[in-house]
UniProtKB/Swiss-Prot annotation:
Keyword terms: Metal-binding, Nucleus, Ribonucleoprotein, RNA-binding, Zinc, Zinc-finger
Gene Ontology biological-process annotations: mRNA 5'-splice site recognition; spliceosomal snRNP assembly
Name this polypeptide is given: U1 small nuclear ribonucleoprotein C
Zinc finger (Matrin-type) in chain: 4-36
Chief site of localization: nucleus
Length: 228
């Protein structure tokens, strides 16, 4: 004889195992019989949805509100298994949307290559070495040019500071070139002055020579002595 009796369905279960009872409780016939049982009970007691809370009284109302299972069944709340299912569906949806927005193989690599191309050739235009840049710029590689290119590499050749450094470098190079151009002229002027000094000295000696200066008088004296 079966051990389990269902008072809602008014039957004895042929399988009284936990699995059999769980299947019976979750069945459609048991649920409909349970609803009908409580409807008949409320009708016999004269309980309607309007006077349901007043019929239970304040103590029963407090028990209902204090019961966590009843709180979960209140409007706006859901049982724990429904919450769990909703969270699972939400997580699956978010994962699908995340995969949808992720870049796919070939397009992702192309975008990455495009970004690397722009960062390599546009954001850092001064990655060439300073010696090659100095040979291209037209002035020899020196201390000032090396400092300039190190500064320009640090600033990536952008902004007003880079332009100011370029202007300062050009002005320094022009000043050095002017000094180099002026120094040979000064040396040549000094050489010409030194070369001209002996010539002027010889000219003065010729003018101050007593023999040359009295040459005319000596001849005149000779002539005078001869005439006498």
């Amino acid at each position: 004889m079966p051990k389990y009796y269902c008072e809602y369905c008014d039957i004895y279960l042929t399988h009284s195992s936990p699995v059999g009872r769980r299947q019976h409780v979750q069945g459609r016939k048991h649920i409909s019989a349970k609803i009908e049982y409580f409807q008949n009970l409320l009708r016999e007691e004269g309980i309607t949805p309007q006077n349901f809370l007043g019929f239970l009284g304040p103590r029963a109302l407090n028990n209902i509100l204090g019961n966590p299972m009843m709180n979960n069944m209140m409007p706006g709340n859901f049982p724990m298994h429904m919450k769990h299912n909703n969270m699972k569906h939400h997580s699956h949806y978010s994962r699908r949307s995340h995969r949808h927005h992720m870049p796919h193989g070939r397009y992702g690599r192309e975008r990455h290559g495009h970004y690397s191309y722009s960062s390599k050739y546009h954001s850092h235009p001064m990655h060439m070495n300073s010696s090659s840049m100095s040979s291209m710029s037209g002035f020899p590689y020196n201390e000032h040019s090396g400092n300039f290119f190190s500064l320009s590499n640090s600033m990536h050749g952008n902004g007003k500071m880079g332009n100011m450094v370029i202007r300062d470098l050009v002005s320094n190079v022009n000043i050095e070139n002017d000094l180099v151009k002026d120094n040979p002229n000064e040396e040549r002027n000094g050489d010409s002055a030194i070369a001209n000094q002996p010539s002027t000295m010889h000219h003065e000696e010729d003018q101050d020579d007593p023999a040359n200066a009295t040459g005319g008088t000596a001849n005149n004296n000779d002539n005078v002595s001869i005439n006498a």
